[in-house]
Structure formats: structure tokens, C-alpha cells
Design a protein with these regions (language model features):
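Sec-dependent signal peptide recognition
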Residues: 2-8
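C-terminal motif of bacterial Sec signal peptides marking the signal peptidase cleavage site
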Residues: 14-17
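Bacterial signal peptide processing site
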Residues: 19-22
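Mature extracytoplasmic or organellar-lumen-exposed domains after removal of signal/transit peptides
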Residues: 24-317
Length: 317
């Protein structure tokens, strides 16, 4: 502490002793957030999150296939979850051609699973267990009325649900688990992680405007956009996604929209979007303190959204 005080005193003395001719103006690196999520380098957009859009679409089609009682098999659902480029696993040709899949990004964040491969493998296996159980427990009993101890269907007058012997809907368990183990985990614990944003020479390259080979964006810009894509990747207009928030997918986007519809949380969609565009603007401005402040906001608000929806489902039974 004495050393710190001494150092501070000497520094202050040096400032006082310097001639005013030598004083340098303090440059404030302020960040102005744009009105929309639009970022350009010259005349070209620097925003890219195609991989996230692809995985959201894959997730939606795979979850829907859980209810395709006429065509789905254990093999077909497993193939959708662990898609290999060129295989005809989906109805969309672009998804079939993609080298992306869901399994590789399940429980795969840097912060939580980089050194914890055994837990990652166990979580991946849970998804495969849901597939096995849906085919082998629920499918044979779709015409049976479910009762405690017996899988089958529950009709409540508005829709029919298909459950296991304990009342669990495997299709919902699969979809909601994707929301957590892929979308939220990749966003919050991977692409917004300082270990990923600042990996290697990312800061230096961003400071110097060095883009990835044959791309318009720096690596740091792209990592931020990939986090953004897990929430807004299928938005009708990704530059102004809150115009349709809650309508663009059945995962995080829907969750944020539903929570935002609650008068008690009516600003949460705006707060999340504002933090995303402010953080991206901070990266462009090379202001990493502001960037990290926005990461904290996004993590808090997305976690709050998931908690609110969890309570809603628990209260609904």
C-alpha cells in the first residue's frame, strides 16, 4: 500500500512539474450506438452469422420431427442432430448441403466445456436419449390415453400432447434443452467470453482493422455477431429484429418476445438489443471496457429471460 501511495504521489508530482506546453489532451474514446444493427466497412456489411441461422433452422426442423409419427425413426432423428454435409436429413437443400450440425455445438462453450469434455459428452448423450425414448416409448403409444405409469397422449381441448410414463414431453425437453445447451451456452459462454473475443491476436488485429482472410470483418467483430445470431439469426429483419421479436423462432427469440409481453418486463427486449448494438459499436471503436459492460448486461438479461420462462412453465404445470 505504501508503494502504491508513493507511486501515485510521484506520478501526480510529475504531472504538476510538466510544462503546459507538454500537456497532451485526454482523448475520450466514446461509443455511439447506431439506431440499428448495421455495421459497414466501406460499402460492405461486416455483419455475418450464417452458421447461427443454419443451426436455428436445423433445431426447429429436428424438434418438429419428434412429432412426425409417420416418418421419423431413431436413425433419422439422430442424423438430423448430428448432420453431415450432403446427407438428405432436412427438407431444405441449404441445410442438407451445410457442414454445420447441432451436436458439435451442444455443451461446447469455451468457458464451461473446454476442459470438461466428459460432462459435454454426457449432455450430448442426454439429447440422444430423448430421441431413443421418443421413438421407443411414445411412438408406440400415440393412440393410448396417458396415465401415471403409461405413456401416451393427453388432450386438453386445445391441443394434444404426447408424454412418457411420467408426463414428460420428450419433444419439449429436446427443444428447451437445445435452447440452453446450444443457443444460450454458445452465446453467453462462448462467443461473448473474453477468452474467445480476445483470443490470440484478436485485440491487436481489431485495433489495426485487420480482417479475416477474404472477409470484411475482424475476428472479434465476427465472434460478437455469432452471439447475436443465436438470438436474431432468423429474424425477418436482423438489423431491427425487435419488430418481430418472439415470432422468428421457437427458441431464444420466442422466449425474449414472450417475456417482453409481460408488463413487468416490457423493456427487456430493447435492453438486450441495445446492449448488442452498443457492444458491437464498442468493438468498432476499439473500446473494450464498454464492450465488456454490454456483455454483462446481455448475460444478465438473457439469464433473466430463461428464469422467467422457467417459472412460467413450473406454474403452468
Amino acid at each position: 500500500m505504501k508503494s502504491l501511495i508513493l507511486t501515485t504521489s510521484i506520478t501526480a508530482l510529475l504531472f504538476v512539474s510538466c510544462s503546459s506546453d507538454d500537456d497532451q489532451p485526454i482523448v475520450q474514446n466514446t461509443v455511439e450506438a447506431p439506431a440499428t444493427y448495421k455495421f459497414m466497412r466501406g460499402s460492405e456489411s461486416t455483419v455475418s452469422f450464417e452458421g447461427q441461422t443454419t443451426r436455428i433452422l436445423m433445431a426447429g426442423e429436428t424438434a418438429n420431427a419428434f412429432m412426425d409419427f409417420d416418418n421419423a425413426t431413431e436413425a433419422s432423428l439422430l442424423a438430423m442432430f448430428n448432420h453431415q454435409a450432403g446427407n438428405m436429413d432436412f427438407s431444405d437443400a441449404d441445410l442438407n448441403a451445410s457442414d454445420k450440425n447441432l451436436r458439435s455445438k451442444t455443451a461446447a462453450s469455451y468457458d464451461y466445456f473446454f476442459t470438461n469434455t466428459s460432462e459435454s459428452a454426457a449432455i450430448k448423450a442426454t439429447f440422444e436419449d430423448y430421441i431413443f425414448a421418443q421413438i421407443n416409448e411414445v411412438f408406440p403409444n400415440i393412440m393410448v390415453v396417458a396415465t401415471p405409469g403409461t405413456p401416451g397422449q393427453i388432450a386438453d381441448g386445445s391441443r394434444t400432447r404426447y408424454v412418457n410414463a411420467k408426463g414428460l414431453e420428450y419433444n419439449q425437453a429436446f427443444a428447451k434443452s437445445l435452447l440452453g445447451a446450444v443457443m444460450a451456452d454458445q452465446m453467453l459462454n462462448n462467443y461473448l467470453s473474453a477468452a474467445v473475443l480476445d483470443e490470440g491476436n484478436n485485440r491487436e488485429n481489431n485495433d489495426n482493422g485487420i480482417t479475416e482472410e477474404n472477409k470484411t470483418y475482424t475476428t472479434m467483430e465476427h465472434k460478437w455477431d455469432e452471439a447475436y445470431g443465436y438470438l436474431y439469426g432468423t429474424s425477418a429483419n436482423p438489423e431491427t429484429p425487435n419488430l418481430t421479436i418472439g415470432e422468428d423462432d421457437k427458441f431464444l427469440n420466442e422466449y425474449v418476445g414472450r417475456v417482453n409481453d409481460d408488463p413487468d418486463f416490457s423493456t427487456i427486449a430493447a435492453e438486450i438489443f441495445d446492449a448488442f448494438k452498443m457492444g458491437r459499436a464498442a468493438i468498432v471503436a476499439k473500446n473494450y471496457e464498454v464492450r465488456d459492460e454490454q456483455v454483462a448486461i446481455i448475460r444478465e438479461k438473457i439469464s433473466e429471460v430463461i428464469a422467467v420462462r422457467g417459472i412460467y412453465y413450473l406454474q403452468g404445470g
